[in-house]
């Protein structure tokens, strides 16, 4: 099963194609807006959303071309539903849902922080459930017990304001 992942929670546009059977990334493409936002002393949500709008399709096309894949190979689409900046999240959601509709494939909303937590399992496939994991990312700090890929219980949690 090939899953297209779309990440637009803040100021970086990310696209990746993941092979769930082989447990490997087919391609990943990232566009950073850090230089643009550094001029303003922080992320400007409207500018971030516009850049996502302009970069998603070219990143997808490049990834597919470079990996000799096509849209027809995609079995499902996963996108960041939050947390994140409202405008950028809306762009990613609209792109994922539109593409999913056009391809007639399932579209899966993903909690950004839980995806980070589950990367421990990707990096160490031998890791057995349940396991404890610590995430420090931006304004979020999470200590969690991961029971399975769909069951996370938060032991300690802080979040950005």
Regions found by a protein language model. Name each.
Residues 27, 153-154:
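A structural microfeature
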Residues 79-103:
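Short Gly/Thr/Asp-enriched flexible loops that form oxyanion-binding sites at enzyme active sites
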Residues 13-18, 133, 141-145:
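Short beta-strand scaffold segments in enzyme catalytic cores
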């Amino acid at each position: 099963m090939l899953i297209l992942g779309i990440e637009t929670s803040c100021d970086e546009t990310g696209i990746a194609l993941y092979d769930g059977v082989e447990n490997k990334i087919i391609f990943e493409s990232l566009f950073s807006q850090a230089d643009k936002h550094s001029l303003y002393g922080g992320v400007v949500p409207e500018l971030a959303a516009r850049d996502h709008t302009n970069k998603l399709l070219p990143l997808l096309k490049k990834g597919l071309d470079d990996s000799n894949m096509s849209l027809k190979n995609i079995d499902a689409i996963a996108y960041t539903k939050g947390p994140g900046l409202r405008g950028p999240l809306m762009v990613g959601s609209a792109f994922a849902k539109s593409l999913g509709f056009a391809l007639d494939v399932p579209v899966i909303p993903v909690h950004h922080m839980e995806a980070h937590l589950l990367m421990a399992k990707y990096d160490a496939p031998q890791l057995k459930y349940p396991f404890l994991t610590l995430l420090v990312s931006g304004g979020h700090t999470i200590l969690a017990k991961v029971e399975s890929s769909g069951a996370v219980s938060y032991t300690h949690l802080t979040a950005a304001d």
